[in-house]
Amino acid sequence: MNEKIAILSAYSFVNIEEPANLIPKLLLIGKRKYVRGTILLANEGFNGSFSGSYENVNLVLEELIKLTGPKDVNVKINYSDVHPFQKLKVRLKKEIVAMNVDDLNVDLFKGEYIEPKDWDEFITKQDVIVIDTRNDYEVEVGTFKSAINPNTKTFKQFPAWVQQNQELLKGKKIAMVCTGGIRCEKSTSLLKSIGYDEVYHLKGGILQYLEDTQNKNNLWQGECFVFDDRRAVTDDLSPVERHWLQR
């Protein structure tokens, strides 16, 4: 029986002084361990998704943590019969998730986590609004029943949507959701920076929610778009091979 391929996703908002210096080291260990995927590095932290054997993806993660020294790392592991990535890439970026807002310190200034097991109860409260921070083409594939779709084509458009919808957000508890946690975490930092106090986000994102809850209350509708060769997954995290999505 063939060993399942582990798909490890990890991110952390942590100050990295010279991220370019880490690229050769990560490429070296990743290629030695036959790991494929993408790791993004920036001064604000790292964001990676890569596949290989369970042992090897964890060795690459250990090296990434050793080189960057974060206090907290958000880690998610799924499994597949095949590699969802073609090769290993380590890239230097201005931001690990591009919002185009300067001087956000997400490491120190962000909203509160809501655990997946508590999410359904929280978002059905009358004073809570749910915002799906993903792009429109992702939301069309699947989202939460009550979620607001900002209809953005890129995450860089999200700050403008917030500015244009302050009356909608006023006086509400704001719950943010995204695929794996990184965009909603950065979104909470944006809202906190402009004066919103009660800001929350789904810990681990949609993928962790589906794994932990199996969508038992049917608040999630549709499938979840993912940024690899699987294209989308069902609420039991099985690949949806029919997906055609164009970005």
Swiss-Prot record:
Reaction(s) the record says it catalyses: uridine(34) in tRNA + AH2 + O2 = 5-hydroxyuridine(34) in tRNA + A + H2O
Leader sequence segment: none
Record has Oxidoreductase as a keyword: yes
Active site location: C178
Pfam families for the chain: Rhodanese (PF00581), UPF0176_N (PF17773)
Keyword Lipid metabolism belongs to the record: no
GO biological process: tRNA modification
Gene3D superfamilies, sorted: 3.30.70.100, Rhodanese-like domain
UniProt source species: Rickettsia massiliae (strain Mtu5)
Protein function: Catalyzes oxygen-dependent 5-hydroxyuridine (ho5U) modification at position 34 in tRNAs.
EC number(s) reported in the record: 1.14.-.-
Highest taxon listed in the record's lineage: Bacteria
Name by which UniProt lists this protein: tRNA uridine(34) hydroxylase
HAMAP family, per database record: TrhO (MF_00469)
PANTHER family hit by this protein: RHODANESE-LIKE DOMAIN-CONTAINING PROTEIN 7-RELATED, THIOSULFATE SULFURTRANSFERASE/RHODANESE-LIKE DOMAIN-CONTAINING PROTEIN 2
Keywords noted in UniProt: Oxidoreductase, tRNA processing
Cited InterPro entries: Rhodanese-like_dom, Rhodanese-like_dom_sf, TrhO, TRHO_N
GO molecular function: oxidoreductase activity, acting on paired donors, with incorporation or reduction of molecular oxygen
Gene behind this protein: trhO
Family: Belongs to the TrhO family.
Positions of the Rhodanese domain: 124-218
